[in-house]
Amino acid sequence: MLHWLDAIVIPFLQSLYGAMGYVGVAVAMAMKGRPVQTRASRQEDWGVTTRFRPMAAGTFKAAVDAQGYPIAMEVHNTGADYAGDQQIRGLTSPPYWMPNYRYAHHKITTHVPVMTRRATGASPNCFYMESFIDELAHAAGKDPYLYRRELIARNPNGKPGVGGVNRKDDWLKALDMVAKMSDWGKPLPEGWARGIAIEDRRRPSRPHSTIGAEVVTVEVTKDGTLKWHRVDIAFE
């Protein structure tokens, strides 16, 4: 018979991607026969020794052809430098075809201690790029899914020092799959909309990484609030 109030041991441990998991294992081994729950209090998780995700900002501008596809793009982003290439991930070699692409990153110094917090540097950079691609598709009057697909399909296979995109077929497969899963193109009720995005966690030194595509179906309610109805995700 288990007496739950006496049998469950709840040590308060730091929780960052399982980095303190070995402590939980040690506690569990010392408390054999009892389930061990590991968690961190808010004060411990965000205590005086914590590091924060850095603030970041980016600017984008592009020149487009007669069909609305980019022929040149210039991207600048800035943020506190940490953990090597974190701040430039996702922007050094986007999957989209652009005959002319210029990227600059500006490091800043801050008194706030910074580091990854629940995600990597590619998170804001993905938001920047995908938001801008949406703006370009809207300006061109094109479907954002098909606009992305065309730009990825046009991009040649990646070559060192030349550009292009590695695993192009996988990018297209993930994009097509999430569009199919979400019934992309199917009419929605009034006030509803779908959004689509695709990225990976590439680093300059690691060109192959998991590709993730996502479609979110939302509704703007009568009182102006945003309601999420569905999220479809495809990984390749």
Labelled PLM ranges:
Residues A28-M31, G79-A80, D85-R89, R117-I152, ...:
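Alpha-helical support elements that line or immediately flank enzyme active sites
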Residues P54-F132, A234-F235:
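Glycine-rich loop/linker segments at domain edges
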